[in-house]
Amino acid sequence: MEFIISATTDIGLTKNTNQDSFSVRQFRSNYGNVVLAVLCDGMGGLAKGEVASATLIRAFEKWSEHQLPQLLRNGLEEQALQRDWNQIITENNEKIKNYGKQTGINLGTTVTALLITGTRYHILNVGDTRAYEIADHIQVLTQDQTVVAQEIACGRLTPEEAERDPRRSVLLQCVGASETVQPDYFSGIPRQNAVYMLCSDGFRHQISTEEIYQYLNPACMTDSECMKKNMEALIELDKQRQERDNITVVSIRTY
């Protein structure tokens, strides 16, 4: 399987700093082509959310350089991958918490990580950044770790009510601000001629699922230039509708 990758980010209308961080890397190995994409949405006082998100991104990048090659040589066993990723989350939860204690600032970050090969994708999720699969239809591959998502699951809110709920952005946990962090894991078989997309919550609040599909479906995402242009068009639509948050989106096109 081959991949085309593209990503873009925008500070948005009101923030002084961009607290989102992302990384997307493609590797060629004996296991075939592999892409690792990670997106983090930081939060914290005095713009220190960017410290939390960048810290976690660097940890995943370091892992991809030093541990991932061995995992690939061993056949990318799912339990071994989750063990590595759990260690990254645990270590950096403590690291960011300690930084916060030293500086007197509360900070933390969400994270969605996607590792995709020709035969399998693996996703880690903490918080409300998301992963989508866009093919003949659009599907959310992650579950938000938020108060409103929990309320929807319990039948106390409808999805439409959740979009207007003042608790919409209240997280159940995040890396650096929780005593312990339990990531959610998802995996599946990647589809050819599909788009795998990661986004921060600022990207999706002001646009509909139908609009995401209209701009980011595989027929519209034929090369990296088209991909970036279409993602930027949706970001501009977000801003026209007065989205106040930072906005980040990463796309991986399979073929």
Language model segments and positions:
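PP2C/PPM-type serine/threonine phosphatase catalytic domain
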Residues: 1-255
